[in-house]
Amino acid sequence: MARRSQGTKLHLAVLCLVVSCHAIGLSDLMERASQRSDKLHSLSTSLTKDLDSHFPPMGRVMMPRPSMCHTSSLQTPKDKEQALRVSENELISLARSLLLAWNDPLLLLSSEAPTLPHPSNGDISSKIRELQDYSKSLGDGLDILVNKMGPSSQYISSIPFKGGDLGNDKTSRLINFHFLMSCFRRDSHKIDSFLKVLRCRATKMRPETC
């Protein structure tokens, strides 16, 4: 009976959260999404620095080029100037497509982090879990956003991830782990940039000043 009561309370809490989110204005939702994307990018930058502290000397030479990131097939604005010329619907679609494309890679990184041949693998593992939490939270927030923006903003590009193995030897695992994190850091910067442009538009600020 107690378990049923707890389940009912949890259901009501989630229901109230959803209802309150839908009652919030578009500019406030944009602000919250921007804060989460900023944290996501900050965490990915911190993780990249952690990995840099114990990287094989030949790692930079052996690491794949950025063009090999699995999300490189998605055409996105190259800089802020280009992003300012893209519509709201397309920017939110690009942000959601990039975020969704990292669900499986983050699962792989999460499973590999605890045994990564790196002296800070415990901290790295903890930060990867944080990335997953923030990614999930941001994704949920963007889902609410697009429901407010209308059907034309709901398109998502499917970007498959085919790399399910980081390798067997220590060097390969470190290099491939670092490569995936560098790709995620690049994409988290794009997501953050797109959402900041959208936030400025929603608050009627001049986007070029953001």
Curated annotation (Swiss-Prot):
Its main location: secreted. Keywords: Disulfide bond, Hormone, Secreted, Signal. Disulfide bonds join 69-183, 200-210. Residues 1-23 form the signal peptide. Pituitary gland. GO terms for biological process: cell surface receptor signaling pathway via JAK-STAT; negative regulation of gene expression; positive regulation of gene expression; positive regulation of leukocyte proliferation; positive regulation of phagocytosis; positive regulation of reactive oxygen species biosynthetic process; positive regulation of receptor signaling pathway via JAK-STAT; positive regulation of respiratory burst. One of its GO terms (cellular component) is extracellular space. It is found in: Secreted. The keyword Disulfide bond applies. Belongs to the somatotropin/prolactin family. This is Prolactin. The gene is prl.
